[in-house]
Amino acid sequence: MDYTPEFQLREATESDRTYLRRLNYLADVFGNEEGDVGHSEREGAEAYVGQWDPERESGIVAFDQFHVPAGGVWLRYWQSPDDGYANLAPNIPEIAIAVENRYAGNRLAVRLLQAAVELAKRQGAPKVALWVDPDNDRARHRYEKFGFANVEGEDDVMVVDVEDFTA
């Protein structure tokens, strides 16, 4: 039976931490659930999800019409310059995003990205940043369409002013 999923979005809470771990895994293996996660990715999971503060940083989780988790995005405001992969400043959140493979092609990632930028704007952030593999031309092209630009000297970091984001 074919169906077009309908998504509901809500702010992430502490109870979503386990699901965010799954999404972090999907992001680390670029959606390939048979992919191996290296040592640095395992350590990164603690920083990106284990130390995530839902009250201060928040995020968005998406569900389909049957209340099945479909994807999510979460913000990390890094305090130390050595933390994170796309850490530009303490007031610029790095966003992490992933969508379950079965929901690919339904523009859910666009809705999540838009919701994350709106959330960051409400929190007073001037910009949002993200890490994207320099060889992932498809993703980089998509982010550029939304207004993201490469950060000079950081070939794997992109940033957009929250006022310039276009979905």
Q: Which residues does each PLM region occupy?
A:
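Conserved N-terminal entry element of GNAT/NAT acetyltransferase domains
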Residues: 1-18, 164-167
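Helix-loop element at the rim of GNAT/NAT acetyltransferase active sites that forms part
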Residues: 22-39, 51
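Active-site rim helix/loop that mediates acceptor-substrate recognition in acyltransferases
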Residues: 36-65
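Conserved beta-strand in the GNAT
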Residues: 61, 68-77
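A short, internal acetyl-CoA/4′-phosphopantetheine-binding micro-motif in the GNAT/acyltransferase core
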Residues: 63, 94-105
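A short, polar/charged loop-to-alpha-helix boundary motif
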Residues: 79-88
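C-terminal "cap" of GNAT-fold acetyltransferases
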Residues: 89-93, 126-140, 144-167
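Conserved acetyl-CoA-binding loop-helix of GNAT-fold acetyltransferases
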Residues: 105-122, 141-145
